[in-house]
């Protein structure tokens, strides 16, 4: 059952798809995605995204360095709190060990049959308080057979996004193989940039009025 809605909390983030709250419960802090404040015309897509996240978190329950699903009742999604900072807040500059650990984390996620699908956003990568990588925000995640051609393609796109971050913060430590992966684009990427990306930008910037470089962090 979901945690009580009258427990003390404060907002971490609010956007058109609801509020993200840090809630103080009897067993400690947890994070709640609250769809109650979502405008009526966005409630269906907000519910669909939250349901998708709940399904992915349920699938990888028990895995380290990802949120643990606590409850989902159609209005509130409760997940475990992970202490740390978003990548853009504490960049892992020159930290090869962090990027190696991040790649191992991705490999484990993919072996469990989940592709994240939203790792271009630095806000979805955490640097935990003890320096480990962690992943959050599984609203766009996909579940499937990790050996299928489609899931292997999505896993490769997840890896490409990680390598783009490594190129940003650790460029001199990219391996020859990683450089080749970055150069080789897939038809999924090309289709997204040709069709989905313009629609995404129109909706998020013209309709929803988002201004944060697609989740990488707030503008100063």
Give the residues covered by each predicted segment.
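ATP-binding glycine-rich loop module of kinase domains
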Residues: 5-58
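Conserved structural core of kinase catalytic domains
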Residues: 36, 46-50, 56-101, 105
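A short acidic, helix-capping loop that chelates divalent metal ions and anchors anionic groups
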Residues: 39-43, 88-89, 144-146
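Catalytic-loop of the protein kinase fold
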Residues: 111-128
């Amino acid at each position: 059952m979901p945690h009580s809605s009258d427990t003390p909390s404060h907002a971490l983030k609010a956007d058109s798809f609801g509020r993200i709250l840090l809630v103080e419960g009897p067993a400690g802090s947890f994070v709640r995605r609250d769809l109650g404040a979502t405008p009526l015309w966005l409630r269906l897509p907000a519910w669909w995204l939250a349901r998708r996240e709940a399904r992915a978190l349920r699938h990888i329950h028990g895995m380290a360095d990802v949120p643990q699903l606590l409850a989902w009742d159609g209005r509130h999604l409760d997940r475990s709190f992970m202490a740390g900072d978003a990548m853009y807040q504490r960049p892992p500059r020159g930290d090869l060990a962090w990027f190696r650990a991040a790649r191992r984390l991705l490999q484990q996620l993919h072996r469990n049959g989940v592709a994240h699908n939203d790792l271009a956003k630095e806000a979805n990568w955490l640097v935990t308080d003890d320096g480990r990588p962690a992943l959050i925000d599984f609203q766009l995640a996909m579940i499937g057979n990790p050996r299928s051609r489609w899931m292997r393609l999505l896993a490769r796109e997840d890896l490409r996004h990680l390598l783009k971050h490594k190129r940003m913060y650790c460029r001199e430590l990219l391996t020859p193989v990683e450089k080749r992966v970055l150069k080789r684009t897939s038809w999924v990427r090309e289709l997204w940039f040709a069709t989905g990306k313009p629609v995404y930008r129109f909706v998020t910037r013209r309709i929803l009025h988002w201004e944060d470089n697609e989740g990488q962090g707030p503008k100063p």
